[in-house]
């Protein structure tokens, strides 16, 4: 099998699975128990939190475990709106956000909030100036993703954070960094965002674990889940210790020689652009700078047909984010692409393990699809 869908999820290394297995079978105590077995697990949880916090660039007591990026996004948006409900009921976001953000904002619109949505340019880029121009005295929150999951576009979060200080210092800033964490270098302290959501399964950790950074400007954040008071009183529920252990181990593995891994992914992406650009009717979509995401379109050939054909050959690529119930995604729609191009968008995404030979095989399969299948659009 050739796996080129790392933006959807990633393989779990054996060392991560082993770390989880040890917790499941030997270190299974509840970390809230008061006897030594439980307190040992509490120390382990805090050690693992510190590992992840170091990679985020924050203090351990600023990082809260969640079940996924979607939970972190929703928690951040709701917490920001709660804190700033007296500032106003206006939110600024973009048309290319993950549905976790867009659908949460739609819910808030139904509750009486006003949402201003910024459109990208033809390459999928969002400028800090366009975001800041939409901020008003009553803007409670700005939510802009760090890296677009379909285009690989990197958005100027640090510039937005700096600009907000001059435009409206009360406005809080949230960024969905699920596709940015350990793929685009950043430090929470330098970035300046008030909320940063990350997810484990995009970097080799298991599904079901993520984290939310909450910065110092967030005063007395509203608890996500009332209950037993876990996660410093903000997210109750017994901690998923095995998933946390796996998350920390995955961070350690990815952090080791990270610069080399990012360089390799960037080289693989550049090689893919070169190989795929030689295929007739194939268009590179956007000019995203993230090293692991590449969207292309074989204009005239429906994306799901391409995905199915390559899948039957053991090559995993995605039309999922670029095709939603047979329609172009909000990201593709926002680019204003011709219909034939938009309907043919597919995504390839890479990991540290991706090889040039795998790109060769994918390119050959795509060329064969083009040469032997009639266009349908």
Predicted feature descriptions by range:
Residues 1-377:
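Pyridoxal 5′-phosphate
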């Amino acid at each position: 099998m050739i796996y080129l869908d790392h933006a959807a999820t990633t393989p779990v290394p054996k060392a991560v699975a082993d770390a989880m297995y040890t917790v499941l079978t030997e270190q299974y105590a509840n970390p809230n128990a008061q006897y030594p077995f439980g307190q040992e697990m509490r120390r382990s949880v805090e050690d693992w939190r510190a590992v992840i916090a170091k990679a985020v660039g924050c203090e351990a007591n600023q990082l809260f475990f969640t079940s996924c990026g979607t939970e972190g996004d929703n928690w951040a948006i709701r917490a920001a709106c709660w804190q700033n409900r007296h500032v106003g009921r206006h939110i600024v976001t973009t048309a290319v956000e993950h549905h976790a953000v867009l659908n949460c904002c739609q819910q808030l619109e139904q509750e009486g909030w006003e949402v201003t949505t910024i459109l990208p340019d033809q390459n999928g880029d969002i400028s800090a100036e366009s975001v800041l121009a939409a901020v008003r005295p009553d803007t409670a929150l700005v939510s802009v993703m760090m890296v677009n999951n379909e285009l690989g576009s990197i958005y100027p979060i640090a510039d937005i954070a700096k600009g907000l200080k001059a435009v409206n210092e009360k406005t809080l800033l949230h960024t969905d960094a699920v596709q940015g964490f350990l793929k685009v270098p950043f430090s929470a302290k330098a970035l300046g965002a008030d909320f940063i959501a990350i997810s484990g399964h995009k970097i080799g950790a298991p599904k079901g674990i993520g984290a939310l950074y909450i910065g110092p400007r967030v005063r007395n954040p509203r608890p996500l889940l009332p209950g037993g008071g876990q996660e410093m009183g903000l997210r109750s529920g017994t901690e998923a210790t095995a998933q946390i252990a796996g998350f920390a181990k995955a961070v350690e593995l990815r952090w080791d020689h990270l610069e080399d891994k990012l360089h390799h992914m960037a080289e693989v992406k550049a090689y893919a652009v070169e190989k795929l650009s030689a295929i007739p009717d194939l268009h590179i979509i956007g000019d995203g700078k993230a090293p692991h995401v590449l969207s292309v379109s074989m204009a005239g050939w429906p994306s799901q047909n391409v995905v199915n054909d390559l899948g039957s050959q053991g090559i995993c690529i995605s039309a999922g984010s670029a095709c939603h119930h047979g329609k172009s995604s909000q990201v593709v729609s926002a680019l204003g692409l011709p219909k034939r191009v938009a309907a043919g968008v597919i995504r390839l995404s890479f990991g540290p393990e991706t090889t040039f030979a795998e790109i060769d095989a994918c390119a050959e399969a795509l060329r064969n699809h083009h040469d032997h299948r009639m266009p349908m659009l």
